[in-house]
């Protein structure tokens, strides 16, 4: 700002202190002061013109603490002269409605989700509600959850599924709608202290039933079969039925009752694959039923597992071998009677023989050469039954038809076709 003034002073000729007459005159101090005032006015006008050219036309915005200033305030002197005027015109924007509403947000209730669900179920006259009904009760009762509805609905669903105090009740066919009902377990009524939902007294756990407690089988079944035979009853259902005594498991059985009333679904196949031998039954008259065999004492889990492996190996030939062996036992001799169920040992040319009771190894029957003209026995089902006891009759070999004698092993086997 001082440089133009200095150049101008240099360019102006120096005034002489002498008059035209050559005499010394007085110094004109006032004239110099007027010249200085004119120079300052010119400089202010030039700076004002420069500012007007740099600014855009219309409303000019200047950053003054994040507030927009009009153009007249910029041209008037670069800022407001009065601080009070600046405070009244340029105040901070008011807070939004959402911010003020957040300030008045209600507090979260001091209840857990289990307590909220229990409240909703107990206020219902039928003491049961669906998931949507529980959420509707909580939203209508507590404004805090009304504002945040979609967020806590999954928490209610998880608490219903994971806690044993809540029981799912299927919807009846005659009642249309969506979703199952949820109710409280009757044994969980003392879960809260004196009806106060602020704190639970204890965590409720539903009692688990031991699998295999009511098994009607002589041998324990696997877990999957035990679950099918003995499903766990629900808590809202009646008390479970008393366990039925396992037949043959206790020595003191009622008179007239057979100890092993329930056997394998296929008795003949089960007897052929089992290692221990039944004890001999007393002889009876021809046509009388065979006495019930006594329970075999040497049955162990390891033996049952080994027999199961052998049964899987010979699964393909088991059906045909069982039918042949059963018919040979029935048609063995003319005057000979069966004194007990014994296994058949394979012989090379179709001859039959029995194993002694002290022989512990399992004799696996093998298929014998068949006659080309003899069809398989059609009436095998007459001798095999799925009941608890097996009744068999013996008949002389001479009274049998030729086909039966051929299958019984009395006729000479022919060359296979």
From Swiss-Prot:
InterPro entries: Fork_head_dom, FOX_domain-containing, TF_fork_head_CS_1, TF_fork_head_CS_2, WH-like_DNA-bd_sf, WH_DNA-bd_sf. Gene3D superfamilies: Winged helix-like DNA-binding domain superfamily/Winged helix DNA-binding domain (1.10.10.10). The keyword DNA-binding applies. One of its GO terms (molecular function) is DNA-binding transcription factor activity, RNA polymerase II-specific. Residues 30-45 have a biased composition (Acidic residues). Disulfide bonds: none annotated. It comes from the Eukaryota. Pfam families: Forkhead. Residues 1-50, 70-105 are annotated as: Disordered. Residues 108-202 bind DNA. One of its GO terms (cellular component) is nucleus. Residues 1-29 have a biased composition (Basic and acidic residues). Keywords: DNA-binding, Nucleus. CDD domains: FH_FOXD4-like. GO terms for biological process: anatomical structure morphogenesis; cell differentiation; regulation of transcription by RNA polymerase II. PANTHER family: FORKHEAD BOX PROTEIN, FORKHEAD BOX PROTEIN D4. This is Forkhead box protein D4-like 3. The gene is FOXD4L3.
